[in-house]
């Protein structure tokens, strides 16, 4: 399915011509600090793609604030607006985490830090490994059934109910498991929620996560490119983070490169690739905006819902 009929299509060359002040641009040092492993996002992308997008999000944010104010005045109520929630979805290894960090830094810059912007990843809403093992679904980690959807729904409900302090579970990619500790966000204005599952919908639930989102983005690329990036990232991690004996994946530094490649390909072909085709990719057309990356990691096309 390639249903972009209800989207405006902007090739990169057209999108980059949208007018926006360059005052909000990041420095090379700031970008380097937030760039993910094997993510080749550049200052050119920041200037040509993300600045116009941040302005668009700011327009949506101000519109939401205005409409809420008008409604409260009409209803003679004095309730502040719930946080503006931005969802960011896409496959493993497509660059979601870096993009989410870019969003946060640029929104902080755009609003001159007069708005509290928080970043949340849905990894913390996975069931702990112990639970996944007990249920026999450790090999389905990242699939819809591996997430504590009730906990995620409560988190979203608390946000939209203007609860003053909202608790967020934390996840470690080092130990490959949910941590015991949590963090609390206090009265945020804008919340960016990043994860492969944020646009998924369970037909048996009364509420869909998308019911809570004010703006949603899907990071897209051809599967062959994502698979290649996944393998490149795996081998980079094998030479760095996996070398620590406490890492969940440390054993894969002790086998040959060919054996490690066989393992990584197996993970893609039986888990990540399957999850992409069966669960993640089909959520693309639920997004308000789709960013499509080319083989070179650069965003080539932008699709904005009409």
Swiss-Prot record:
Keywords: ATP-binding, Coenzyme A biosynthesis, Cytoplasm, Kinase, Nucleotide-binding, Transferase. Pathway: Cofactor biosynthesis; coenzyme A biosynthesis; CoA from (R)-pantothenate: step 1/5. Disulfide bonds: none annotated. Its EC number is 2.7.1.33. The keyword Cytoplasm applies. It is found in: Cytoplasm. The keyword Isomerase does not apply. ATP binds at residues 90-97. Its main location: cytoplasm. GO terms for molecular function: ATP binding; pantothenate kinase activity. GO terms for biological process: coenzyme A biosynthetic process. It is an enzyme of class 2 (transferase). It catalyses: (R)-pantothenate + ATP = (R)-4'-phosphopantothenate + ADP + H(+). InterPro entries: P-loop_NTPase, PanK, PRK/URK. One of its GO terms (cellular component) is cytoplasm. It comes from the Bacteria. HAMAP family: Pantothen_kinase_1. Belongs to the prokaryotic pantothenate kinase family. This is Pantothenate kinase. It comes from Listeria monocytogenes serotype 4a (strain HCC23). The gene is coaA.
